[in-house]
Structure formats: C-alpha cells, structure tokens
Amino acid sequence: MIALIQRVSQAKVNVKGETIGKIGKGLLVLLGVEKEDNREKADKLAEKVLNYRIFSDENDKMNLNVQQAQGELLIVSQFTLAADTQKGLRPSFSKGASPALANELYEYFIQKCAEKLPVSTGQFAADMQVSLTNDGPVTFWLNV
C-alpha cells in the first residue's frame, strides 16, 4: 500500500466541476492499493500518515505530525501509484489491486484516519481534478 503525502496549506478535489472535498492546512494523501494489500497494511499506513512528523514546530524544525499541527486530511484514490515503470515507455498496472479490493481498502483507510482527525475525500474511480498549494514543498512517498 502506497501513500504519496504532500503537506499543503489548502487542497481540493473536483468531480465534474463540483468540489467534493477540500481542506485547509494538512496533508493531501494520494493512496495506491496493490494486489497483496490487506487491512493490516492499511492500519500500518494510516498510523504512519497520522504520525509522520513533517510539520514545523516552534523552532521551525519538522517535528510535528498532522494531528499535533491540528491539520486535516484530503484522501484521494490514485491507482497509478501502483504502476511498474521499470521497463519500457508505458506503465504496467499488473501490481495494482482489483477495483473491489482497492475500494474496500480505500474506504477502510479513510475510516481509520477519520477516527483521529477531520478527513475529506475524493471519489473512488472517478475522473478527478485535484488542486493544492504544496507547503514547502514537502512531499513524501510512504510504502508499507
């Protein structure tokens, strides 16, 4: 399971011209699910996202997690994160989870994160437009 997390001052996701999710300060989480993923991996990744210390403390050091920074999460499904790009000029999605498994684990990941702080979401399998203001920029690839 993969999360590309970006520290943002704001982010939103639109579907068919309508904003369906938006946050202020927090993390934009692009979530990719691979075919070997399960709830245990989702639990580990949620814990890592919620506790990863990438917000500045009073000394301007990355020392606070999103909860301590009183931030929010915008979680967006992103199947292309599971792509294999090692060969050729076209990505292979053979490592990606089936849509049913990916949706189940996406919803489960959202539920786990929402137990700790405010969460907005994209729409699974939709054509979405995501806009953000990356704060830093600060972007990390988390894989469990």
Curated annotation (Swiss-Prot):
S-S bonds: none
Top-rank EC class of the record's enzyme: hydrolase
Localization terms from the record: Cytoplasm
Highest rank taxon of the organism: Bacteria
A single GO molecular function term of this UniProt record: Gly-tRNA(Ala) deacylase activity
Catalytic activity: glycyl-tRNA(Ala) + H2O = tRNA(Ala) + glycine + H(+); a D-aminoacyl-tRNA + H2O = a tRNA + a D-alpha-amino acid + H(+)
Keyword Transmembrane applies: no
EC number: 3.1.1.96
Keywords linked to the UniProt accession: Cytoplasm, Hydrolase, RNA-binding, tRNA-binding
Protein's GO biological process: D-amino acid catabolic process
One Gene Ontology term, aspect cellular component: cytoplasm
Pfam families on file: Tyr_Deacylase
Domain notes: A Gly-cisPro motif from one monomer fits into the active site of the other monomer to allow specific chiral rejection of L-amino acids.
Function: An aminoacyl-tRNA editing enzyme that deacylates mischarged D-aminoacyl-tRNAs. Also deacylates mischarged glycyl-tRNA(Ala), protecting cells against glycine mischarging by AlaRS. Acts via tRNA-based rather than protein-based catalysis; rejects L-amino acids rather than detecting D-amino acids in the active site. By recycling D-aminoacyl-tRNA to D-amino acids and free tRNA molecules, this enzyme counteracts the toxicity associated with the formation of D-aminoacyl-tRNA entities in vivo and helps enforce protein L-homochirality.
Assembly and oligomerization: Homodimer.
Family indicated by similarity: Belongs to the DTD family.
Annotated HAMAP family: Deacylase_Dtd (MF_00518)
Name of the protein this chain belongs to: D-aminoacyl-tRNA deacylase
Protein source organism: Haemophilus influenzae (strain 86-028NP)
